Amino acid sequence: MVCLGSGCEPRAVGDYLERLVDLNGLAVFVQTLLPAFNDAVGEAWASGRLGVHMEHHYTEAVRQTLYTGLAKLRASNAKPRVLITTSPGELHGLGAMGLQVALAVQGAHCVSLGTQTPVEEVVSAAVSMDICVVAISASVNQPPQELLAYLVALRKSLPPPCRLWAGGRGLLALDGQLPQGIDHFQSVEEAVAAWRLLLHVS
């Protein structure tokens, strides 16, 4: 994003993102534009072309934009209900929040537990809230084998009818390693399409 370069005004990023939402709609923003922006910012940060403070500034601007979008959506209690979080040690939550907004636009009832939720807490929430899908978002910063162990433990602990979804660039390192019962989605669009299918059978 050009507006993250040197001399960027504090409000410029937020204003730019809000204009994109107004022009394209919230669904297109979270399913198409936001993933591309997140990848570009992550790569720029990893290569040293973007300072930590600007990466944090971008993250907060996105959060505020998504919070604003969520606040405008009508609350839903419809099934299938989706619980969204990240594994312990995974602080990056933009992917999870983007999925939450994308599903909420479709009318889904989403429960966000924020980031870094232990297995036992996810399971407890899923059971008590009658959750149909648990969705885990993972960035490239998450050690692959730690992520795999977390997903396997979740699958073993969740009630069999509860589906377990996983997505984000952190899953790329686990290609072919995910056991049966864990659905890997490579894009927000795929997850939204899967939720729509569940909607018709719930």
Locations of the language-model features?
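C-terminal regulatory/effector modules of DNA-binding transcriptional regulators
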Residues: 49-51, 56-202
